[in-house]
Amino acid sequence: MTAVPTSERAPIAARLAPVLDWLRAHVPAGADLTSDTRKLKTGDVFVAYVLGNVRQRGDGRPHIPQAIEAGVSAVLAEAHGYVVPADAPARILPVDGLSELAGPLAAQWYAVPGPDALRVIGVTGTNGKTSCSQWIAQALSRQGERCAVVGTLGTGFVDALVATGFTTPDAIQLQHSLADLHRAGARAVAMEVSSHGLEQGRADGTRFDIALFTNLTQDHLDYHGTMAEYELAKARLFGWPGLRAAVINRDDAAGGRLLAGLRAGIEAVEYGIDGEAAAQRGAGHWLRATNVRAHRTGTTFDVDGSFGRATVHSPMVGLFNVSNQLGVLGVLLMAGVPWQDALARLEKLQPVSGRMERFGGEDGPLVVVDYAHTPDALEQTLRALAPITGARGGKLWAVFGCGGDRDPGKRPQMGAIAERLAQHVVLTSDNPRSEDPQLILDMIADGMEDPRLAIQIEDRAAAILHAVRHADVHDVIVVAGKGHESTQEIAGRKRPFSDQEHVRLALAARGVNA
């Protein structure tokens, strides 16, 4: 079979055309595309591309015999360095640069509609992606146009998510999901877009209408190497072909650089808390929160900007959640929701699973489960709960660890943050993966001035139980790092584990209602 030639300079559409023509001529209608042999069904098309960036490599072509044995109707294979076996029992089409075409190919194969029928909103940043995407979906769904979610908690509508195991699914699965969501009634999708996903091309083929940037703090340096490379990966979303609007956190230095680099024609909204008024810089659209007041049941803040002024009463706590809500507000406005309507929806947002999720607090200590797993996120979480702890007349506990096989540089930083902001620190396992759990705890403790003040309990369930059992009735306990996760990975094996469930059990053991 002659390979379909491509050129680095040829438009994607021109490169796709012969591949689509070949598929339509040789593959039955309704066949699925997949690059995962575990998901193959009889009649499917196996897409055997090669990942060749400097940080991830993979080659699907050695799995072609397995795919053929599974009964695929055809195979698309990366052409470079590949010769179709003369006795191949299935149709195989070699394609140059197949990995770059996988997303756009799937988008056309599954007939994913454009922004007029399916508005896709991309949310990127170190922290806040899940909360913002969930809140965007909650708010837009109140308009009558159902909004789905793709992200860390899963894919689907907010009340019926299906776990995928990835923040951003692979390019083919993502386009298949977008088409399925549209057929199920979605008219918008709020999608978490990770730096890994952007760099590995998982979002390729997606027609983003609006992009939201939350923040950039240290994380994933085990993958990206430097903060500059990490920022560059995030920035790809804001140079996306066809992007109409960008909502950007101006409080973050990386946000300022994104705003400065936006191409002409992209409508921008910048937002922040206090600080210099965007109007003084001649910014077009802007939002600013001032006079932030924390109380035991949430936060109240004033918001003003180019759209109007108002006071917002939110059930969420923490300055970081004020920032996240400003970002969501900017997205709603760019999606055409009127100012007063957008504000009303903002006040009706509900907390997200594993994000500042509260348990107890009435007849026992208040326990908060949060996904904070970076230095900045842990600091923001502890700072957010400090005034609540003070109002209760108690002390603040931090129960956390750090993930194995991930950026080790953040471990001592998180130890130092916990020692500085919490009165009690319990170090425990997060997802140690292939690393020795005790070595991870020791690295966290290395960042503390007096590590003897921290209690080390490797078993996470026992650590949670210890904190709940020994906390005063007025205390606040933060169980940080895993949030919504339902498993814990130790020595390469995942086992069922839920922070929420173990918090409930610990409170019950103390005789306290969760």
From Swiss-Prot:
It comes from the Bacteria. Meso-2,6-diaminopimelate binds at R406, D430, N431, P432, R433, G481, E485. Its cofactor is Mg(2+). Pfam families: Mur_ligase_C, Mur_ligase_M. ATP binds at G125, T126, N127, G128, K129, T130, S131. A motif (Meso-diaminopimelate recognition motif) lies at residues 430-433. The keyword Chaperone does not apply. One of its GO terms (biological process) is cell wall organization. Its EC number is 6.3.2.13. One of its GO terms (cellular component) is cytoplasm. One of its GO terms (molecular function) is UDP-N-acetylmuramoylalanyl-D-glutamate-2,6-diaminopimelate ligase activity. It catalyses: UDP-N-acetyl-alpha-D-muramoyl-L-alanyl-D-glutamate + meso-2,6-diaminopimelate + ATP = UDP-N-acetyl-alpha-D-muramoyl-L-alanyl-gamma-D-glutamyl-meso-2,6-diaminopimelate + ADP + phosphate + H(+). UDP-N-acetyl-alpha-D-muramoyl-L-alanyl-D-glutamate binds at T37, T167, T168, S194, Q200, R202. It is found in: Cytoplasm. Belongs to the MurCDEF family. MurE subfamily. This is UDP-N-acetylmuramoyl-L-alanyl-D-glutamate--2,6-diaminopimelate ligase. It comes from Ralstonia nicotianae (strain ATCC BAA-1114 / GMI1000). The lineage of its organism: Bacteria, Pseudomonadati, Pseudomonadota, Betaproteobacteria, Burkholderiales.
